[in-house]
Every structure is written in C-alpha cells, then in structure tokens.
C-alpha cells in the first residue's frame, strides 16, 4: 500500500488493495478473521509448524508461496504464526497485508473508522551492520 493518508470513506483503488475473488488478501491468501491480534512472524516457513505444534488447537492452516500461516489456541489465547520468507520486501508485504486484514473493510474497500493494533513479535535471527557484532 502507498504511504499516504486515506480518508476512511474513500475507496481504495484495486491496484493498491488486491483482494481475490474469494475475499482474501492477495499474497497471504487470508480472510480478515483468519488472524489473531497476537502474531509471531518467522522467516523460515518450516518454523511455523515447529511453533504451532505447541498450540492446543489449530483452526487455520494456509500456505501461499513462502507465506505459511497457522492460527490457533495456546493456553486459552488465540495466536497466529506466520512466515515472511527472506528480505525486507517480503516483510513489507506481510506487515501491510496484516494491517489491511484488520483495518480495511474488504466489502467497501475503505479504511475502518476504528483501527485495530496488532501485536507482532519477530522470532528468529538477523544480521548486524557492524563487523564486530556477531
């Protein structure tokens, strides 16, 4: 999505918000109700199952390209774990599409008046910009 303010009653152009015929956000292939407010993101898609195997139950299992999503219950709390793949481009897609899932009305193609804040936790490794930091 473009980095600009959109009035909540102004329709978002189809080129800026790609929703499939099934009503799912394009890259993640998810419906708005498929995610929890608490989300763990990992780079490697194999880590999704390693984490969700500890869930008490899994209600959503979706895979599209490098994006694997499991949503379920853990100790009475609804959680989503989602793989981003590699690179900042993929993370940008994931974060923008997660935001769209909770803050855009998919029927009207407008932003919701009340916004939902997601709790996103990154689990994994990252490189360093300084050679002396491993």
Q: Model regions: which residues?
A:
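Metabolite-binding pocket within alpha/beta catalytic cores that recognizes anionic/polar moieties
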Residues: 2-134
């Amino acid at each position: 999505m473009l980095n600009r303010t959109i009035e909540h009653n102004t329709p978002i152009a189809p080129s800026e918000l790609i929703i499939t015929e099934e009503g799912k956000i394009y890259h993640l292939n998810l419906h708005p109700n498929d995610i929890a407010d608490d989300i763990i993101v990992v780079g490697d898609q194999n880590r999704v199952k390693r984490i969700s195997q500890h869930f008490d139950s899994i209600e959503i299992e979706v895979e599209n390209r490098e994006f694997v999503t499991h949503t379920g219950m853990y100790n009475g709390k609804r959680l989503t774990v989602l793989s981003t793949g590699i690179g900042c481009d993929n993370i940008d897609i994931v974060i923008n599409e997660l935001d769209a899932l909770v803050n855009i009305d998919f029927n009207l193609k407008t932003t919701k008046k009340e916004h939902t804040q997601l709790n996103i936790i990154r689990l994994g490794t990252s490189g360093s910009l300084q050679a002396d930091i491993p």
